[in-house]
Amino acid sequence: MEMAKKKAVALVAAFLALVMAFAAAGCGTKGTGKDGAAAKKNELLFATGGTAGTYYPLGGAIAKVWNSNIPGINVTVQSSGASVENLRLLDKGDADLALAMTNVADDAFKGKGQFSAPLKNFKAVGVVYPDVVQAIVAADSNIKTIQDLKGKKVAVGPTGSGTEVTTRIILAAYGLNYTERKDLQPVYATYADAVDQFKDGHLDSVWNVLAVPAAAIQDITTTKGIRFLSLEGPEYEKLLAENPLLVPYEIPAGTYKGQDKPVKTVAINSALYVRADLPEDLVYQLTKVLYEKKDEIAQGHDRGRQIDLQKALAGITTPVHPGAAKYYAEKGIKLP
């Protein structure tokens, strides 16, 4: 009887050992072994923006070029609320790579604006392209100046986006506050939703901070006449003086259908940021491909043509990742 019990125990132990061995082998093929761990580390999530904006399709073009030029990585693009949300995703480790406006990144690092505390788990790689503030109204609207937006229904950008942050700063410079005084009716719509609402006459104005020309605005002009609001007067000079990361920009006449005059506005650089703990060699490769394969990126999205190594650190105020810094050192570019 005792012998039978011992045999049963031995058989159970052997069976459990066999199950554990198979489990370990199975897990090893999915990432617990040396090769599996490396594969897991190279699965990268790239936070971008709304599907109707610039970040998402541009991010897709960049990811495609990374995947085809850097062995062993797989970058997956994810739509998001853009800059503010993207930096929070990096900080929490829920994304590995992200696009964000440099002014929003500056706020995040310092714990200002929409960030109640500093975010530290992200580092800069470099500037990708300039985003341009583009404020539109209907062609037959009686809104002629920024101040005329008082009491109007205005799409200010998605919650958690660089568009909303920048729009709020600009409107405040012209004496309009929609977060406390409710000087106007803000609509926190995605670009796609804002386009539809504007076409249907439910919005008085739409503010975009996008590359020029913006597909969202081009979409509107196919069915509706528009007019741009220029940034003018002493408020404009004060805006630039108090916000050094904003730079003067002029949208050339003829950029959009029915736009017969240049538009005076501002631009803000959009840059690539990564998790602070990404390996140096990986970020070096990502940086190298970003700036040396811009023509390939441009085949997927026209903004690729604006990627410029000589402007890679323009407006970058947050720490640069060591992997990117290594690449810049090789190219003779000094860190800010």
Identify the role of each PLM range:
Residues 63-71, 91-95, 110, 172-176, ...:
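Sec-exported extracytoplasmic/periplasmic mature domains
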Residues 28-47, 118, 142-153, 322, ...:
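Immediate post-signal peptide segment of exported/extracytoplasmic ligand-binding proteins
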Residues 128-132, 266-267:
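Short, solvent-exposed loop/turn segments at the edges of secondary structure
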Residues 79-82, 86-97:
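Divalent cation-coordinating acidic motifs and surrounding scaffolds
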Residues 43-69, 73-77, 131-200, 314, ...:
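Bilobed "Venus flytrap"/periplasmic-binding protein-like clamshell domains
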Residues 102-104, 111-114, 120, 141, ...:
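Pocket-lining segment of extracytoplasmic ligand-binding domains
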Residues 257, 261-336:
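Segments of small-molecule ligand-sensing domains
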Residues 1-43, 336:
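Short, low-complexity disordered leader/linker segments with a strong preference
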